[in-house]
């Protein structure tokens, strides 16, 4: 599945717009990661546990958006975007969304 952040795909013609696609993941913090993150905020540096967690969540959100597009018969997703929001204390949502199209 071709996924782009632009509204068009160079060299390809969009023949049909199918609709919005989404994929989301709500990820909670692990207590052990949270304790280590607390130390990192005191001493500085990258919080690798959270970086890895968000990277995995972003990949899963994208996979779910692709599955949504495939279920609509799409060849590509254009205008792909990611957003992150806090759902509750200790949990964040990663949302991937875009427009499913046929080429």
Swiss-Prot record:
Pfam families of this UniProt entry?
YbjQ_1
Q: Which residues form the signal peptide?
A: none
- Extract the coiled-coil ranges from the record: none
InterPro entries per UniProt: UPF0145_dom_sf, UPF0145_YbjQ-like
The cross-references to SUPFAM superfamilies, in alphabetical order and at most eight, read: YbjQ-like
Please give the HAMAP family that the UniProt record associates with this protein: UPF0145
Which family, according to UniProt?
Belongs to the UPF0145 family.
The record's listing under PANTHER family reads: UPF0145 PROTEIN SCO3412 (PTHR34068:SF2), UPF0145 PROTEIN YBJQ (PTHR34068)
Protein name per the record: UPF0145 protein PBPRB0184
Q: Which organism is this entry from? A: Photobacterium profundum (strain SS9)
């Amino acid at each position: 599945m071709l996924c782009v952040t632009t509204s068009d795909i160079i060299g390809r013609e969009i023949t049909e717009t199918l609709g919005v696609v989404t994929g989301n993941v709500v990820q909670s913090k692990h207590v052990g990661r949270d304790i280590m993150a607390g130390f990192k905020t005191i001493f500085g540096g990258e919080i690798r546990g959270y970086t890895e967690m968000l990277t995995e969540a972003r990949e899963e959100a994208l996979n779910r958006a692709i599955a949504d597009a495939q279920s609509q018969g799409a060849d590509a997703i254009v205008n792909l975007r990611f957003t992150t929001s806090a759902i509750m204390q200790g949990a964040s949502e990663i949302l991937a969304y875009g427009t499913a199209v046929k080429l």
